[in-house]
């Protein structure tokens, strides 16, 4: 059975405990389709807190378990700093190919 086309999801603004459930829902909807790839664009995200990071880690684990490649691009500013401090940049796929998702 052929897998669905790659999914592209963009987020913007501040991702925090107040709205990370919406992020989780959008990622979950894409993951349920079981596409070969999901590109997540964070280029318009100004900040992210631990709940947003946890959502990205959870989505990455789910994607890996089902054979989907989840790439996170457009990382900059506070988001890039926090990923580096937490070393999540070594766990999450921040491939350059997802920079313009």
List the predicted regions and their residue ranges:
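STAS-like cytosolic regulatory interaction modules
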Residues: 1-51, 57-101
